Amino acid sequence: MTRRAILKGTGSALPRTRVSNAELAERVDTSDEWIVERTGIRFRHIAEPDETTATLGADAARRALEAAGLQPADIGLIIVATATPDNTFPASATKVQALLGAPDCIAFDVAAVCSGFLYAVSVADAMLRTGAARHALVIGSETFSRILDWNDRTTCVLFGDGAGAVVLSAEDVADDRGVLATRLHAEGRYCDMLYVDGGPSTTGTVGHVRMQGREVFRHAVTNLAAVLGEVMRDVGLSADDIDWVVPHQANKRIIDATAKKLGLPADRVVLTVDQHANTSAASVPLALDLAVRDGRIKRGDLVVLEAMGGGFTWGAAVLRV
């Protein structure tokens, strides 16, 4: 028997307001054709003032708990991956805990931008396997609309708000269910290629997203293909063994180029970027939840998750559902 972190449930939440490219073009110098051609994005959800990273994360968590057949009191660990917390402190994870009515447990945030959910899964996996908790909520939640420069069409058209969550539970299993391997990387010398130009210890302001798009694209395709190869080799798998890839939903061109580099057919890649845009740390769990709920991802499927974000940070995980 081997102790592993088993996927017990998924959930997601989106803000009430959905904005099309055409609607965005009414306030930004852009067009539907320009956005779709370069990104594949058609819609994004934008949070209203009463919708925050914590409230969206809590909504996604409730749905994941329901899918897992668990109550908030069962949870011993809450990790929220976010680059847009409600406050500098306390951690959004503690606010989610309060919103859920969960009792005393471990709760903290992880900040690795778009890779945050992969980092959080890796941390939760290690903590569950070593007995720190039996059940964990791992959440990616973002309100990136709060840090966008709406006069910069190269960035503001790319992002949306939302949340996704999974329940992972420690179980002793005889088969290969659960999280089988994770791989994480960071290369800080590229931190000025995708960043926010503000912060409490530098400007005292929130700041806005800034990006060197061409460089991000180049590094993303190379790094994501490499880390997917690494994590599959860790468990002795090839592309032919994978049932589904759930990639970070940043840009359809990046997703397509990465899949092509690995020899993965498009019909095995979960794609939601057209409906949600780039929701940063929320994108992978949000896409995972949709694919589970619509029946594409089924029990027994081998699923690979991958993401890259500012820093640069990047990572991948492979799990048997």
Curated annotation (Swiss-Prot):
Q: Which organism is it from?
A: Sphingopyxis alaskensis (strain DSM 13593 / LMG 18877 / RB2256)
Would you tell me the Gene Ontology cellular component terms? cytoplasm
What function does this protein fulfil?
Answer: Catalyzes the condensation reaction of fatty acid synthesis by the addition to an acyl acceptor of two carbons from malonyl-ACP. Catalyzes the first condensation reaction which initiates fatty acid synthesis and may therefore play a role in governing the total rate of fatty acid production. Possesses both acetoacetyl-ACP synthase and acetyl transacylase activities. Its substrate specificity determines the biosynthesis of branched-chain and/or straight-chain of fatty acids.
Predominant localisation class: cytoplasm
Catalytic activity reads:
malonyl-[ACP] + acetyl-CoA + H(+) = 3-oxobutanoyl-[ACP] + CO2 + CoA
Q: Name one GO molecular function term.
A: beta-ketoacyl-acyl-carrier-protein synthase III activity
This one is known as Beta-ketoacyl-[acyl-carrier-protein] synthase III
Q: What does the sequence similarity comment in the record state about its family?
A: Belongs to the thiolase-like superfamily. FabH family.
* Compartmental location: Cytoplasm
Listed GO biological process terms:
fatty acid biosynthetic process; secondary metabolite biosynthetic process
What positions constitute the catalytic site? 114, 248, 278
Region ACP-binding: start-end pairs: 249-253
Q: In which pathway does it act?
A: Lipid metabolism; fatty acid biosynthesis
Enzyme group, top EC level? transferase
Q: How does it assemble?
A: Homodimer.
Q: Please give the record's comment on domains.
A: The last Arg residue of the ACP-binding site is essential for the weak association between ACP/AcpP and FabH.
